[in-house]
Amino acid sequence: ALLQIEENNHILNQEIAKVYTLYRANQIEPVLLKGQGVAQNYRNPLHRQCGDIDLYIGPKNYEKANKLLRTESTGEHEENHKHTCIHWHGVDIENHRVLSRLSSPSSDKSFQQEIARWHGTTACRNLEIEGYQVTLPPLSFDVAYVLTHSALHFLNEGIGLRQVCDWANILHTQKDNIDLKEIADLLQKWGLSKAAKIFGVVAVNYLGLPMEDLPIPYTQKDIETGEWLLNDIWQGGNFGQHNQNRKQRPKGYWSGKWYTFTRA
């Protein structure tokens, strides 16, 4: 199983290099989100269970990027207002027109403004993955976004321990490079301070992350909710998608849980 995970990572990394080469030849500079970029913070990046390739394109080059992939596509998943998922060279590539949306209008406005501030500028980071250089979001945004994505995933489908591991690993591996106050400010603007504390409970108490690596330290009153989150992860299966009952839960159930998860 481990050899298969390593092989899958190698394949995905090779396809990242190919899609970057294709886009760059057509004057598109994609920003790699989550996945293989986050994996580089693991002790062995090849041992993280990988998925698809998420690329932030933005509205300007979105249709152009989709058209480029479609010439060698073998299938396509449903397109929504945020992204298109295209099966290309045996892997799924998500081209994002919109990086993500937050439910609160004021939080979402701050989130979109932050993306507009760095997208297409030298504020982005460069990272080598298996010898090929790719573009990532600025570090503070990236750390805050890893948590944001997991919190949204939790609401919609549930999460697995991998999502908490991703956040713990990026915080710890990058501890000498990151600005914890800047990350805390972003999370506060996006309405995710409480989520950061709850994830912190799991990361510190169960994954061994030092408390000082957290952007927003949790308090005693957050521990019970952190335990509830961990229990929800165990019930949901490996990646939070194995529990079929979850899809049948009423919307009010999840909005109630979301309130518990995000209120300060």
Q: Which residues fall in each region the model found?
A:
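Conserved NTP-donor binding/palm subdomain of two-metal-ion nucleotidyltransferases/polymerases, i.e.
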Residues: 1-51, 57-264
